[in-house]
Amino acid sequence: MNFLRKYLNDIKPNFEPEGKLHAFRSLFDGFETFLFVPNQTSKTGVNIHDAIDSKRIRSFVVIALLPALLFGMYNVGFQNYKAAGALADASFFSMFIYGALQVLPKIIVSYVVGLGIEFAWAQWKGEEIQEGFLVSGIIIPLIIPVGCPLWALAIAVAFAVVIGKEIFGGTGMNIFNVALITRAFLFFSYPTKMSGDAVWVANDTIFGLGNTLPDTFTCATPLGEIAQGAAVNSSLCDMITGLIPGSIGETSVIAIAIGAVILLWTGIASWRTMLSVFVGGAVVAYIFEALGMTPIAWYEHIVLGGFCFGAVFMATDPVTSARTQCGQFYYGAIIGIMAVIIRVMNPGYPEGMMLAILFMNMFAPLIDYCVVQKNITKRMKRLTNK
């Protein structure tokens, strides 16, 4: 990388205040800091020195997402060949490559639109470019069905970045999870592209790979089958491994668990939030099962849909989640409880994780405020009793 560092140093004077390309200084700074750690340190104020900066944090999150992404690519191919009845003649390699060719365009569109808007916004405002979309750009394709068209994805990403992030002040200032804003926009603006029985399995060929399925072919997710009153055709083993229809990166509990271990080991995600989401969801699902209000076991609610993915990667978002230790327990538990309640009580919307997290994003600051005020009150009482 020394040659690249030398090249950037050589052209850097062109972007200085007196340089001919000074108008694009923010773009150069953003590209430079993305590749290299800045060589400047603060000289005033109280500073905390840590080897983990925001860029490294986001890099670790992307690494944690890779198992879900790679398995999602394979599952896209698996579902296509399974629907065509061609599993016996298909190899792992052909299914994975086919899935990758279906998923990569969505990743490219997500990053090009999102980063393009962030670069343009930073240039317009004369601000430094942040790496905030590095994580959102890869999460967004993972939480949508493979049948979602690229044009709809581009519109949704643009809406989420501008309305859900930049108008709040940019990276670190948004109150809603950007990836979930994208999904919510798609769900409410283009519902037929995000739900139903025709969006979960790719139905065309790419470079001779895959199979063209009839226009009449439909395939529901397990939660969709439950909402329709039908029996679930997937086994618990398939639910855990992820060989079921669903959003690209949300089906494999094993792949998500690997990502969870990485996030917890690096200390990036809060174990309090993550644990309380699962506990809250499991308790309410068990109650519904005991009352005979749900046709599936309580543990199947945990492994189906976007519950695991949301609990690990989105409920723990450090920007939009609760930050106090006690508040994280309340925040996570309510998310898990709400997700299951929405699933069971609203048959028209079988997946409740998105709405549960977005709803609690609004209340995360209030939860932290109440926890802090409660601690202040306790300390004041101790002081007055001395």
Residue ranges and their predicted role:
Residues 1-107:
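N-terminal signal-anchor module of multipass membrane proteins
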Residues 42-48, 114-125, 162-172, 258-266, ...:
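C-terminal ends of transmembrane helices
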Residues 96-110, 147-156, 239-253, 295-307:
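Structural signature of hydrophobic alpha-helical transmembrane segments
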Residues 113-118, 133-142, 157-164, 255-263, ...:
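Hydrophobic, membrane-inserted alpha-helices
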Residues 128-209:
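Membrane-interface helix-loop-helix junctions at boundaries between adjacent transmembrane segments
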Residues 154, 175-180, 298-306, 328-330, ...:
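Loop-to-transmembrane alpha-helix initiation sites
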Residues 172-257:
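Long hydrophobic alpha-helical segments that form multi-pass transmembrane helix bundles
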